[in-house]
Amino acid sequence: MKRLITLVFLMVFALTGGAFAADTVKIGVYLPLTGQMAFGGQLELEGVQMAHKEMPTILGKKVELFVVDNKSDKVEAANAVKRLIEKEKVVAIIGTYGSSLAMAGGEVAEKAKVPMVGTSCTNPLVTQGKKF
């Protein structure tokens, strides 16, 4: 799991090219921390936090994580991604556990052209036709 999350971080950083002008790289993380999928979301959060502890900087820039609970709900997942993009101004997003939640949040990220990497999505529709 640690290697997977580290790989995800590297992929996100590669996709965010111009985002390295600031001293801090803001990465959003949206996971089901409550609700029926909370167990999987908690495990993924532990993996993301472990990878962040191992790699708190990239190319000399501090990595700051913004974690949001999508409450195991598709509407909340879309709202969480919107909040990460509009309020927190993240340059990339990691998440989420649950393909249906990833598809809901993915639509928002795609429209905003913010790269998003799913850590455990299994449905091919999550990435089908997506550039970000």
Protein language model regions, located:
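Extracytoplasmic ligand/sensor domains, especially the bilobed periplasmic-binding protein
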Residues: 89-132
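Extracytoplasmic/secreted envelope proteins and their assembly/folding machinery
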Residues: 45, 49-52, 78-82, 102-110
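Short beta-strand elements in bilobed, periplasmic/extracellular small-molecule ligand-binding domains
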Residues: 58-71, 130-132
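Extracytoplasmic "Venus flytrap"
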Residues: 28-47, 55, 68-75, 97-100
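Short, well-structured alpha-helical segments in soluble
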Residues: 67, 74-91
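Short helix-capping segments at alpha-helix termini
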Residues: 55-61, 112-114
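Sec/Tat signal peptide C-region and signal peptidase I cleavage site
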Residues: 16-21
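Sec-dependent signal peptide recognition
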Residues: 2-10, 14
